[in-house]
C-alpha cells in the first residue's frame, strides 16, 4: 500500500501534545510506519452534542492525503493529523506544527464501581499551556487542520550525555 490510515478517532480529546505517547490511533499508524509504509493517525475533535462535520473532513483530507502520499519519496513518514470540529466555511486551512504540551494532569481519584470494588481513575488531562502558540493545540482550536510529522525515537538526547556520565561507574562495574 501507498499509505496506512489509522482510524478516525472521534472524541472531545484528540491526539495532540503528549497524547501521542499513549494513543491507540497513533500506535496503529506507528505499526504501519515500522513496516516501511507512510502512515497517518487521524483524529477529529468533537464537541459534545454536536454532529461530526463530515463535509469538513472530506474537504480537508482530499488534497492533504494526495500530498502526503507524494512525500514518501526517500523514506516513509509517520503523520499525526487533527481535524477541527468546524463547518466547511469556518475551516481556516492546514498548518504543519509541532506538538504542544499541557499543564500537569489533575490528580487521580478513587471510586467504588457497581460491584463494590475500589477503582482508581486518572484525573482529567491538564489544559494546554498558553505559551504554546504555533502548536497543534492552539491552531486546531482556531479552526486549522494540524499536521505533525512524528518520530519513533523517544531518546532524550539533551540528557543522554549527563546520564552516561552519572551512570558511568555502574556501566563499568557491570559484567555481562
Regions found by a protein language model. Give the residues of each.
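Hydrophobic/aromatic beta-strand patches that form the interior of the parallel beta-sheet core
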Residues: 40-42, 79-81, 145
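Short, glycine-/small-residue-rich phosphate/pyrophosphate-handling segment
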Residues: 40-67
Amino acid at each position: 500500500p501507498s499509505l496506512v490510515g489509522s482510524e478516525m478517532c472521534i472524541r472531545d480529546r484528540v491526539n495532540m501534545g503528549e497524547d501521542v505517547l499513549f494513543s491507540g490511533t497513533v500506535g496503529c499508524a506507528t505499526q504501519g510506519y515500522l513496516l516501511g509504509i507512510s502512515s497517518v493517525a487521524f483524529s477529529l475533535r468533537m464537541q459534545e452534542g454536536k454532529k461530526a462535520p463530515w463535509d469538513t473532513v472530506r474537504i480537508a483530507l482530499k488534497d492533504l492525503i494526495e500530498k502526503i502520499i507524494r512525500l514518501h519519496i526517500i523514506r516513509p513518514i509517520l503523520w499525526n493529523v487533527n481535524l477541527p470540529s468546524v463547518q466547511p466555511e469556518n475551516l481556516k486551512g492546514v498548518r504543519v506544527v509541532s506538538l504542544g504540551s499541557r499543564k500537569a494532569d489533575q490528580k487521580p481519584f478513587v471510586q467504588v464501581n457497581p460491584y463494590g470494588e475500589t477503582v482508581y481513575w486518572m484525573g482529567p488531562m491538564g489544559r494546554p499551556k498558553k505559551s504554546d502558540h504555533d502548536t497543534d493545540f492552539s491552531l486546531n482550536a482556531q479552526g486549522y487542520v494540524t499536521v505533525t510529522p512524528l518520530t519513533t525515537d523517544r531518546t532524550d538526547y539533551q540528557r543522554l550525555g549527563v546520564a552516561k556520565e552519572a551512570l558511568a561507574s555502574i556501566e563499568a562495574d557491570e559484567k555481562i
